[in-house]
């Protein structure tokens, strides 16, 4: 039996907006498997579509650059421990040096990039007094590349065809705001579709609908689901009356691929439970 910790219950509450007791019960029934707990809660109507895991906790900056010929681009995440250091001139200069090297030498392997700058990173850590991590790097190649940085916390790079610079920037801004996971509805992996289909079917059947009617209901829900998680299926943030797919079609353009980085995605700082800490100190005294 997996121990159901307060941290696990807290994460499930944040992702489902359900009550504490419901979350604890769901985790017990799922033997601590948070994804299974979410699926079961959705089927029973205790939770709507859950938020994705990936609480933003780490600090740092996102950098993105495209080569002079516009055909090759690099996007990079550089982490530190505090927002104060993220704004430090020396930290930013280090990030610029790293991404310039990644672009010039076409370094797409994070381990190679880390090794190249390890000595400088260690020196900067000693100077600043915080841990610094070249966390991830990704590259795109294409006919037309565009980037968008929202502050220094969100970065997007888009590879497109048939689009001008302004359109690519608008698409990148949309991606920054709407967080699509795939380019087109057809790109959603079969296992993701199958999982969502089963959840929606169970919900429909448990609501009392005959299986045949439930199947037809789910067809519509699945079209909505794949549209919502894909770029071309989403309503365009600057004009919600049309989808991004409509916008691209109007301009005889297409998006081949995109990358979206947000500072600290998937990283959690260790959070101290103050009450537990006080209790522990009391026992020691």
Curated annotation (Swiss-Prot):
Residues 82-85 are annotated as: Involved in Mg(2+) ion dislocation from EF-Tu. Coiled coil: none annotated. It holds the Pfam family EF_TS. GO terms for biological process: translational elongation. InterPro entries: EF-Ts_dimer_sf, Transl_elong_EFTs/EF1B, Transl_elong_EFTs/EF1B_dimer, Transl_elong_Ts_CS, UBA-like_sf. The keyword ATP-binding does not apply. Gene3D superfamilies: 1.10.286.20, DNA helicase RuvA subunit, C-terminal domain, Elongation factor Ts, dimerisation domain. SUPFAM superfamilies: Elongation factor Ts (EF-Ts), dimerisation domain (SSF54713), UBA-like (SSF46934). GO terms for molecular function: translation elongation factor activity. Transmembrane segments: none annotated. Keywords: Cytoplasm, Elongation factor, Protein biosynthesis. It is found in: Cytoplasm. GO terms for cellular component: cytoplasm. NCBIfam families: tsf. Associates with the EF-Tu.GDP complex and induces the exchange of GDP to GTP. It remains bound to the aminoacyl-tRNA.EF-Tu.GTP complex up to the GTP hydrolysis stage on the ribosome. Belongs to the EF-Ts family. This is Elongation factor Ts.
